[in-house]
Amino acid sequence: MAPNAATKKRAAARDDDFVLTLSDDENDIFENGVEEDGDNAQEDTLSSSKKRKREAAEAPKGKNKKQKQLKKSKKGESAAGAVSDDQSSEEDEAEAMDAGEDDGALDSEFEFDVGGNANTGVIEGFDGWEARNGASLADAPKNGDKKAVDIDDIISRRKAKKEAELKKKQQKEKKRREEEGEEESEGEDADSDGGMSVDFQDDELLAADGFGMGADGADESDDDVENGSNDSDDSEGKGSEDEESGDEYNDDDAASDNDSVATPVHHPDDEAASDEESEAESEVDAEEAEKRKAFFAPEEKSTAVSTFNRSFQDFNLSRPILRGLASVNFTTPTPIQQKTIPVALLGKDIVGSAVTGSGKTAAFVVPILERLLFRPRKVPTSRVAILMPTRELAVQCYNVATKLATHTDITFCQLVGGFSLREQENILKKRPDVIIATPGRFIDHMRNSPSFTVDTLEILVLDEADRMLEDGFADELNEILTTIPKSRQTMLFSATMTDSVDKLIRVGLNRPVRLMVDSKKNTSMNLTQEFVRLRPGREDKRLGYLLYLCNEIYTGRVIVFFRQKREAHRVRIVFGLLGLKAAELHGSMSQEQRIKSVENFREGKVAFLLATDLASRGLDIKGVETVINYEAPQSHEIYLHRVGRTARAGRSGRACTIAAEPDRKIVKSAVKAGKAQGAKIVSRVVDPAVADEWAAKAKGLEDEIEEVLQEEKLEKQMAQAEMQVTKGENLIKHEAEIMSRPKRTWFETERDKRAARKLGATELNGPSKKDKVKLSNKDKKRLDDARQRHEGNIGWKKGKADREAPKQGKNKGGKTKSDKKNKIKMKGKK
């Protein structure tokens, strides 16, 4: 009887204090409309403790977790201690059954997840321009940016203003006509219709099949039909595409441009240049070869074949690294990754080269993360520095590295211009493991941030190393290399890596391993290269050709490269006035504007990205279909980097270059390299009449372009004035704090910085025209005398040496002084 009394006590306590949770089959109860009486409810409560184990075993895991949470919360409300003890013991048993502790059997549906990707979402379309949380970089807060001037706002305001003026003018005209009277106006209209004042010179009023129409261009149209130029709307490169005539730069198609133009013969410079190139390629200096043999470590040929097509798991990487690779959907390593990762894990210096879009960033980030997993954690220390030539490339590398290190405790910091110095200093105080920076901002913090030390750096990476070794970055790179420890691992990567030992030896490499996946500087095999030739005398129509291509052929996901910032900005205004959605990217923009332009292009808000060579290196934007070169670049290496923005990671793409006579050398080298590689080379012929029509449209916008530029200039001046006012207010408000800060120092003078910038511009755009220097009066007089002598106005003026020389003229007797001297000598001998 004792057990029955205890059971009744428990039931009474449960009825008073314990609130029942809803069962798993509550929906069935409500659907059937069955309500339980009090007695039935008591019976269910009495038997609930016996059924709980069975319900917990049959219910799904998700529901069990919710029930446990509810039971735990209700358990605290119970007043009877005995009841709570029984419930807790029963819940522990249910949890043990849920955890699989009742027996040692393994679930038949269990799958071992190597990459650890079961609970983390795979990033299907991995893009290096997304923030770590998936948000857009343009939405991230930025400090220190200047107030931006939006060209689209200026153009839209001008359009709205013109529409308002036109509407106002129409209303005035309508009001004037109403005042004059409708009958009189109708009579005037009837008279004007009755007179034969139609201008038959207007082509729009004449039928296309009328007498004499099309006679002038009949031959040209026939040629165009034969060449297939009417199929220019096809994105697969229709028009006139001739793969066989690529190396001769389509000289046989002169008749398609103008029948009166004779087919030109081979240019003599082509043959001379080709001879020089062949000699330079065939004759490798023996001394340079000996230098390379002594400088580079011997290559291991046996490992190259065995490591082909292996997976990331074969590298014996740690599980957090494999999970990070799986989260961004990296499964099979690329050739450069297969070669680099094992060597980098050994701590050796590396000089690596591969085609654009082959995964060079992951090739050096993965071994760095693997080595950092085994670092001492007692004292936080900065151990890795990755240097990039541009801000965009540094931001992109930072995003890729942070995503790969999602499942680790490795910390990162990006030091690039355009972001707040104070925020970067606060991050550097925490001593992040990896620092991704541009050289200028890295040196700034190295000299002026007391919390930043480089004495503990163990790994140095130079991405786009050939650009970093050029004259524009030489001084900054030397400053960094002489400051950081010499006992470090150094890795250099680029698509166009140099082999010059004299340049590489400056970096302080120690017997580096040379990993050249593509040593011939080739393009992607999925890239189709097109060339549009401008005949001599048509260089001023270049913008017309570009507008035709962007309106008719390539209408979306296009990057257009320019040599100069001024030209890119001007074309950006032309595109806006013609209704083409475009963004620009160059060095004169603020960091906020630059990131916003890339984000708008990446998200498809704009169809065209007008950029300088700032975006030619390393920029990885998913889905770029076409690259257009407004003019050929300075060198073949820059051309490879430009066209490498498309056809990345196995995708297809097109590159179109608008080339004139001065661009012949670059086009010839590109065609030669493409044919040697087996790439698709195509010549596209554009109807000159169509190009002239677009060029005329652009020329008609000259006045409006100047007005937009003037309005933009005024807005910039206003923004500058506002900034100066704010600066003055801050100086007054925070005078003590500002004056107490130490002055920031730099290792170069302003003159040296200007010289370095000039050298960098020369590397990209070639030597500029000779700078104008004010001549002194002495130089002016010398030039005037030379011009007068050349014109024959005055004779040659004797110099001092001519005036002091003895005269050789004849005397009165007809004999010279030398004759007299010889006669005296002869008399002495007699």
Curated annotation (Swiss-Prot):
Residues 62-74 have a biased composition (Basic residues). Residues 159-168, 768-792 have a biased composition (Basic and acidic residues). Residues 1-117, 159-295, 757-830 are annotated as: Disordered. It catalyses: ATP + H2O = ADP + phosphate + H(+). Keywords: ATP-binding, Coiled coil, Helicase, Hydrolase, Nucleotide-binding, Nucleus, Ribosome biogenesis, RNA-binding. Residues 341-515 form the Helicase ATP-binding domain. ATP binds at residues 354-361. Residues 689-735 form a coiled coil. This is ATP-dependent RNA helicase drs1. It comes from Aspergillus fumigatus (strain ATCC MYA-4609 / CBS 101355 / FGSC A1100 / Af293) (Neosartorya fumigata). The lineage of its organism: Eukaryota, Fungi, Dikarya, Ascomycota, Pezizomycotina. The gene is drs1.
